[in-house]
Regions:
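Conserved C-terminal alpha-helix-loop-beta "cap" of PLP-dependent enzymes
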Residues: 72, 77-145
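Active-site C-terminal subdomain of aminotransferase-like
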Residues: 1-91
Length: 145
């Protein structure tokens, strides 16, 4: 990819995302454009300090491992139980198509994120894991599925 972003909250950062340009292809006046459109936080160096620490000694990857492994377990369970994954995402985010009765039943116990209506009777929902997701929480969700 020419550009992508790295989320911080999945690994415990207070807030923020890092935009990464991979081929020395940062658009001309990129920082100025961000400032002019209100997308640059005051005291943004605090955000940078988090990522500086997270990118040292592979800390980001070490912390993210839990979120990604938890998401992988949930993806496997969804497939095994016949759910349709909307697309494959090798991250801590899972996008799954569900009917409304299933969503209603699950939302009595867990928080799902609405993504979009797939059709008249199905909705694409988002399930996220994080550095703090426990194996017990994953087991509970799998049982609910």
């Amino acid at each position: 990819a020419d550009v992508f972003y790295i989320g911080g909250t999945k690994v415990g950062a207070l807030f923020g995302e890092a935009v990464v340009f991979t081929k020395h292809n940062t658009p001309k006046h990129f920082l100025t454009l961000i400032k002019q459109h209100g997308a640059l936080l005051a005291k943004g160096f605090v955000l940078g300090a988090q990522f500086d620490a997270l990118f040292t000694d592979n800390l980001y990857f070490k912390i993210a491992r839990n979120a990604n492994e938890a998401a992988d377990r949930i993806r496997e369970a969804l497939r095994a139980k016949g759910y349709t994954l909307t697309f494959e995402a090798p991250t801590n985010q899972i996008f799954v198509t569900m009917d409304q009765p299933t969503i209603d039943r699950l939302e009595r116990e867990v928080k799902l994120g609405f993504t979009e209506k797939a059709d008249d009777t199905h909705t694409v929902m988002r399930i996220c894991t994080s550095w703090a997701t426990t194996p017990e929480e994953v087991d509970q969700l799998i049982e609910l599925l």
